[in-house]
UniProtKB/Swiss-Prot annotation:
This is Small ribosomal subunit protein uS4. It comes from Stenotrophomonas maltophilia (strain K279a). Keywords: Ribonucleoprotein, Ribosomal protein, RNA-binding, rRNA-binding. SMART domains: Ribosomal_S4 (SM01390), S4 (SM00363). Gene3D superfamilies: Ribosomal Protein S4 Delta 41, Chain A, domain 1, RNA-binding S4 domain. GO terms for molecular function: rRNA binding; structural constituent of ribosome. The lineage of its organism: Bacteria, Pseudomonadati, Pseudomonadota, Gammaproteobacteria, Lysobacterales. The keyword Transcription regulation does not apply. Belongs to the universal ribosomal protein uS4 family. The gene is rpsD. Residues 98-161 form the S4 RNA-binding domain. One of the primary rRNA binding proteins, it binds directly to 16S rRNA where it nucleates assembly of the body of the 30S subunit. With S5 and S12 plays an important role in translational accuracy. InterPro entries: Ribosomal_uS4, Ribosomal_uS4_bac-type, Ribosomal_uS4_CS, Ribosomal_uS4_N, S4_RNA-bd, S4_RNA-bd_sf. GO terms for cellular component: small ribosomal subunit.
Length: 209
């Protein structure tokens, strides 16, 4: 199954939520009509109450699209989360947040996760001084993240850092030196530090059936 490369607003409208697929420099509602479903009849589509299954499925689809994962990848993360000690839903979000592409995004080196993934795949990122081009690489507490000299010179990276600073986007669990294009992954985030608009319990319920 190929990765989706179509209009990102279409995905956001389908889920009725900001999937962080576009730069936060402009308000999302000025770019995507979230209240309008995609398709020719999206503006007039009837809104009915979703079944429990449909609600769970929509939440899973939303999170998959936020992190840019295919179903098999996402299911594998869930399986891994279910074998770890603690809350399965929280474990799942922590695994997703500690992906290298997500950490690069959280540090403000890219305005979106897809842009961060491209930086990683093009060998623009190092972890503890070693080049890593695997977006799914799991970052550990204390890891030092840095951009290559070539990547640091890219205008899009410099613009991303400006946007991150203006909107105070970097979370407390990363430490960034924007002048040196480096960052430290301080610790795996707690649930209180993770996205509040995600209901991971619905995903656990879906996969537990």
């Amino acid at each position: 199954m190929a990765r989706y490369i179509g209009p990102t607003c279409k995905l956001a409208r389908r889920e009725g939520a900001d999937l962080s697929l576009k730069s936060p420099a402009r308000a999302l509602d000025s770019k995507c009509k979230l209240e309008q479903k995609p398709g020719q009849h999206g503006a007039t589509a009837r809104k009915g109450k979703l079944s429990d299954y449909a609600t769970q499925l929509r939440e899973k689809q939303k999170v998959k699209r936020i992190y840019g994962l295919l179903e098999r990848q996402f299911r594998n993360y869930y399986k891994k989360a279910s074998t770890k000690k603690g809350n399965t839903g929280e474990n799942l979000l922590q695994l997703l947040e500690t992906r290298l592409d997500n950490v690069v995004y959280r540090m403000g080196f890219a305005v979106t996760r897809p842009a961060a993934r491209q930086l990683v795949s093009h060998r623009g990122v190092t972890v503890n001084g070693k080049s890593v081009n695997l977006a799914s690489y799991q970052v550990k507490a204390g890891d030092a993240i840095a951009l290559s000299e070539k990547a640091a010179k890219q205008l899009r990276v410099q613009e991303a850092l400006t946007v991150a600073a203006q909107h105070d986007l970097s979370p407390s669990w990363v430490e960034v030196d924007s002048g040196k294009f480096t960052g430290i992954f301080k610790a795996v985030p707690d649930r209180s530090d993770l996205p509040a608009d995600i209901n991971e319990a619905l995903i656990v319920e879906l996969y537990s059936k």
